[in-house]
Amino acid sequence: MVEGRPFPWGILRERMGKLAQNYQGPFLVEGVGGWRVPLDSSLGIREWAQELSLPVVVVARNSLGTLNHTLLTVDSIRQSNLTLLGVVLNDTSPKPDDSSITNPALLEQLTRLPVLSLPYQSTQLPSLPAWLTPL
């Protein structure tokens, strides 16, 4: 349910189909709240991503607890047989703590995925790494 109404799967499927017919470039489809968030009583973000068969980029906050949440998400995405391109970490605090400093390298090592770490309230994005340039 979205705002008390059934989730509009049919409309989304139709619009994504038209978009795919008319546009050859990459698609960016944003999830909400996390990989396993339900969108209605039977389907969620994971199932939507599986239906679309698009590559996945995990976006996570860079703070204490991120390792566990991100590793669980990466494992679930891999079990879903989807292509996982990498992880983007957003710094959500102006004062980095020890975990936010070590998280990027640890996640690269533990997931064997590229990790892009974005600084707190950056006004200018860094150059995109090669694994994100198709997006």
What is each PLM-predicted segment?
Residues R46-E47, A105:
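Active-site phosphate/pyrophosphate- and oxyanion-stabilizing loops and adjacent acidic/basic residues
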Residues V74-L135:
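C-terminal lobe/tail of nucleotide-utilizing enzymes
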Residues M1-L43, Q50, N62-L71, D75, ...:
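ATP-dependent carboxylate-amine ligase catalytic core
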Residues M1, P55-V58:
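Short amphipathic alpha-helical segments at helix-loop
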Residues L28-E30, V57-V59, V88:
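Structural motif
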